[in-house]
Amino acid sequence: MMSPLVIKLGGVLLESDNAMMRLFKALLDYQKSNKRHILIIHGGGRLIDDLMNKLSLPIEKKNGLRITQSEHINVITGALAGTANKILLSWALKYKINAVGLCLADGKSVNVEKLDQDLGHVGKAKPGSPLFLTKLCEQGILPIISSIGITDDGLLMNVNADLAATALATTLKANLILLSDISSILDGKGQRISEINYLQAKKLISQGIITNGMIVKVNAALEAARVLQRSIDIASWQNTDQLKLLFNGINIGTRVLV
């Protein structure tokens, strides 16, 4: 059997019925003819931003990571582990996919500790135990996992979903796809880069071609490639037929090399 596949969802996907339809149709079609274990992990940055704005709460970021004050973590947990997670679960059920909504702490699948005092309740994700998630997958259940973690002393932590996905893939010795509305990494002329390695990526970052949140995404992919010793795909959900190719290991976006 192929290695498990972790699909990290991001961008506007959670807000787009069209995107959800394409994704879950592709997943359903793929599962009909393939026995590969698939897991979904997600963030929900835009959903959090909308909620924070409605509540007149400040949105602060440092190096692409959200600063999460102690008085805000319950709101963010509700948005990610609650609303965003259950939206995805509802789409899975709509397409008759047997799924369960989880967070990083369930089954101790991903361990989390505080990343940086200045960031507040922002967690650093580390590999955990594969047993719980493997058992679910073996029963034909699709785990849908939010990027909310819990520390050993019981503190809720908001974890960058790209970094959480890396830790999850490491836990399961899985392949990793970073799926969003961004189809690929672009060069200085706006052209797709089909493959990129560490030195090339760092050069584009130093040149200001890769910026902001994309830096976190690329660094997460580079770290995942290093830890897993396998390439990582950055791709878009836009084309259903291409998604099926992607699930079978064919590069449709940018492949981050070891």
UniProtKB/Swiss-Prot annotation:
One of the GO BP terms on file: arginine biosynthetic process via ornithine
UniProt superkingdom: Bacteria
The keyword Ubl conjugation is annotated on this UniProt entry: no
Site (Transition state stabilizer): K8, K217
Cellular compartments annotated: Cytoplasm
Protein keywords: Amino-acid biosynthesis, Arginine biosynthesis, ATP-binding, Cytoplasm, Kinase, Nucleotide-binding, Transferase
Top EC group: transferase
Gene3D superfamilies: Acetylglutamate kinase-like
Residues bound to ATP: D181, I182, S183, S184, I185, L186, I209, I210, T211
GO annotations of cellular component type: cytoplasm
Any Pfam family the entry gives: AA_kinase
Subunit structure and binding partners: Homodimer.
Role summary: Catalyzes the ATP-dependent phosphorylation of N-acetyl-L-glutamate.
Entry protein name: Acetylglutamate kinase
Organism name: Buchnera aphidicola subsp. Schizaphis graminum (strain Sg)
Encoding gene per record: argB
